[in-house]
Amino acid sequence: YIVEIKEMDAGLRGRNGIAVVADSFWTAQKARDALQIVWDAGINGTVSSDSYSKKLKQKLTEPPTVIIEEKGNNDEVFKSASAKLETDYEFPFLAHATIEPVNCTATYKNGNYELWGGFQIPGNIADTLPALFGVKRENLKINLTLMGGGFGRRASIDNASEAMQIAKAIEQPVKVYWTRTDDIQNDAYRPAMYHKLSASLN
């Protein structure tokens, strides 16, 4: 099976794509590798870690847009200081990279969905996905399993949304799991940061 994954902002953070369904992971992987798809990367297609790092560094040369707290006359203190220290700290985007990549098992039958997965906040799934799929909350049963690490990543509901779409499309039980490459490419990253710290000593 080749199943289209449609864009659902609340469930997939605006993503869409194609799911390959087979009777084994190896077969599905080989079938996916054989697909020739041209993706439109959109306005962020040229953005990279390097280009974003340069943008952050450039922002530090501009006047601040927000000052959280300011006491005394910092400019005068720095001018009269006998010694000065200044350094930059950069923190890159970080993926959760859980030991167990994102996955979810789902069934669909007669308007009822059932999920199995290591969900950190199952209430998010119960509160959000029934409405998106046009069913009542009681038509979705969630079974919690052990998880190989979470770190906040399994608070997202994108894997559950994908599994529900595929299960309904093929009307068979389906186990959705991402490769490590999928996991890294589609994670909700910890934000990158760039800081400049200056200190004066007397």
List each model region and its residues.
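Structural alpha/beta core scaffold segments of enzyme domains
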Residues: Y1-N202
